[in-house]
From Swiss-Prot:
Signal peptide: none annotated. One of its GO terms (cellular component) is cytoplasm. It comes from the Bacteria. It catalyses: L-glutamate 5-semialdehyde + phosphate + NADP(+) = L-glutamyl 5-phosphate + NADPH + H(+). Pathway: Amino-acid biosynthesis; L-proline biosynthesis; L-glutamate 5-semialdehyde from L-glutamate: step 2/2. It comes from Aliarcobacter butzleri (strain RM4018) (Arcobacter butzleri). Gene3D superfamilies: Aldehyde Dehydrogenase, Chain A, domain 1, Aldehyde Dehydrogenase, Chain A, domain 2. This is Gamma-glutamyl phosphate reductase. The keyword Metal-binding does not apply. The gene is proA. Its main location: cytoplasm. Keywords: Amino-acid biosynthesis, Cytoplasm, NADP, Oxidoreductase, Proline biosynthesis.
Length: 412
């Protein structure tokens, strides 16, 4: 593995110093190549889908794994959007002159070699490769075993574009050892790798966080909530809740729990249940909720569960403070939303809820690099340091200080 990672590290100097025009041209060629070779990708994806069925992978995971012509087109569009963005490198973030006449500039630079560990979704391969390339970074990708054929096909196409442009193919690499042991070895290679970004299940995140000797930015689970305040606009509630839960239940930005102010619960619960039942949502409720509707009794464990399925907890709360306390206790710091027309309550919620993304009168489903206008994302960071929320190209940079002098020496 060391030889492989040394090649990746050697590539980083070349990639870090590419000009914006060259990077954008190569990215657009990558997008073209994905479309041109879509049948090649789909044939390899079919192998993964066949294996998924044989291994009884659940429907949510199979949906994440599936590629179609439309999804490949979306992958290409995401790469073009990344290419169209402003280059994040070489920006003067700050500058000043010291009392000794030193001209100091704080300038954005690439992080270096980034290891990205992910599961199921093959589009992550092209998204993260493009984001890293645009931001001058080299990526070492470790996808899930269930998507091995798809990931290899996509990486092969992207690497061929690099080769045709006389650029090092190791700038986009799949980890040769895709086993758990391979991951365990990768996350100890701090001599070669500068950052690890794991995105996937809770067990993967915990394993990487506890064992890595390399800095980690986590794409952790999404236990997201919507709080319906007593001053909510009833005409907005139903569409937002259905979108946040039912549009894509397997997404990390879908909600798992609905918190409802006690003063509005009786007015909206029956209508909500009727609407959600039309979408096949399984409901679990707290004792007070069960006084209004028929639902499965919710346990304490349910409020700590990321279902990744069309299941929704409902809890009635006394006020916004109880809602915030519940989110603080059970949320994962991902995305939280309040539905209200009361500015004071909204401001309190947005200020006091500790999460990467906090919304007022909108669905949590917008927590996404594409929806934020970032083109794509490496992940949705639930960390508080370096990066938080959807990680676009700006979040894949660090900085250095450039100091210009005229012969100054330090005295004293």
């Amino acid at each position: 593995m060391q030889e492989f990672l040394q090649e990746a590290k050697n590539s980083s100097r070349i990639i870090a110093n590419l000009g914006s025009a060259q990077k954008n041209r190569v990215l657009n060629e990558m997008a073209d190549a994905l479309i041109e070779h879509s049948s090649f990708i789909l044939s390899h994806n079919q192998k993964d889908m066949n294996d998924a069925k044989l291994n009884n992978l659940n429907d949510a995971l199979q949906d994440r794994l599936l590629l179609t012509e439309k999804r490949i087109q979306d992958m290409a569009i995401a790469i073009r959007q990344i290419a169209s963005q402003q280059d994040p490198l070489g920006k003067i973030l700050n500058g000043w002159v010291t009392k000794d006449g030193l001209n100091i500039q704080k300038v954005s630079i690439p992080i270096g070699v980034i290891g990205i560990i992910y599961e199921s979704r093959p589009n992550v391969t092209s998204d993260t490769a493009a984001l890293c390339f645009k931001s001058g970074n080299v990526c070492v990708l470790k996808g899930g075993k269930e998507a091995e054929n798809s990931n290899k096909a996509i990486a092969t196409i992207l690497r061929e574009v690099l080769r045709k442009n006389n650029l090092p193919e190791y700038a986009i690499s799949l980890l040769p050892d895709s086993s758990r042991e391979g991951v365990a070895k990768l996350i100890k290679q701090d001599k070669y790798v500068d950052l690890i970004v794991p995105r996937g299940g809770e067990a993967l995140i915990r394993f990487v966080s506890e064992n890595s000797s390399i800095p980690v930015i986590k794409h952790d689970k999404g236990i997201c909530h919507i709080f319906i305040d007593q001053d909510a606009n009833i005409t907005k509630i139903f569409d937002i809740v259905v979108n946040a839960k039912c549009q894509k239940p397997s997404a990390c930005n879908s909600i798992e729990t609905l918190l409802i102010h006690t003063n509005i619960a009786a007015l909206i619960l029956s209508g909500l249940v009727e609407t959600l039942s039309l979408h096949g949502t399984i409901l679990k409720g707290c004792p007070e909720t069960l006084q209004h509707i028929n639902a499965i009794p919710a346990t304490l464990e349910d409020f700590d569960t990321e279902y990744l399925a069309n299941v929704l907890n409902i809890k009635i709360v006394a006020n916004v403070d109880e809602a915030i306390t519940h989110i603080q206790r059970h949320g994962s710091g991902h995305s939280e939303s309040i539905l209200s027309e009361n500015y004071t309550t909204i401001n309190k919620f947005l200020s006091e809820v500790d999460a990467a993304c906090v919304y007022a009168n909108a669905s949590t489903r917008f927590t996404d690099g594409g929806e934020f206008g970032l083109g794509a994302e490496v992940g949705i960071s639930t960390n508080k340091l370096h990066s938080r929320g959807p990680m676009g190209i700006e979040d894949l940079t660090t900085f250095k200080y450039k100091i210009y002098g005229q012969g100054q020496i330090r005295k004293g």
